[in-house]
Amino acid sequence: MVRARLYATAIGTYQVFLGGREVGSEYHMKPGYGDGARSISSQTFPVEQFLKDGRFTIAFLIGTGWHDKDGADKMAETANQTGIKMLLRIEYADGTRQDITSGEQDWVAVPDGPVEKSGIYYGEDYHQGKYISLKNMLQTGSMEDRTILSGDSLIPVSYTHLRAHETDS
C-alpha cells in the first residue's frame, strides 16, 4: 500500500473508526452544517497508519446533529434522519487500487450503541459502558449482537450535493 484515503460524509454528525481507532478526531460535529437535501460537506482523511496490518473494521457512530427534530426548521426534508456515504480508496505500489464504499458491501448495525440521543440543541445522552463494549468489538472484529444492513438500505446521500469541507485542501 502506498496511499490510502477515506472520503466521508453524513446526514447528521458522525465519528468514523478504522480498527477501533478514531479517524479525524481533531474535528467535531463532522461533517459540519449543511442541509442534506441541498448541500453537504465531505471530509478527506489520510489513513495509511490505520491500515498497517491489512485487516481492519470500518465503523461509524452517527447522530442526528444539525438534523435533529428540534432544530430542523431549515432541514425539514432530512429532519431526524441519518445516513452515511464513504469511500475508502487504497492504492498499491503496482498501480492497482481497491475501493470500499458505503453503497456496495453489507454493513453491520449495532442498534444499541453508546449515543442514546443527540441533537445540536439537545446535546447528547451517552452511555460509556456501551462505548467500551463497541470499541472492543471494533478492535477484535467480533460483531455478535448485530444486524446486517445492505449498503442500499442506508439513507442515500446524493453525490450532487457533496462539497469539500472548508478545512480540506
PLM regions with names:
Residues 161, 168-169:
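Single conserved hydrophobic/aromatic residue that forms the stacking wall/gate
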Residues 137-163:
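Flexible inter-domain linker/hinge segments
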Residues 1-134:
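Accessory beta-strand-rich segments of carbohydrate-active enzymes
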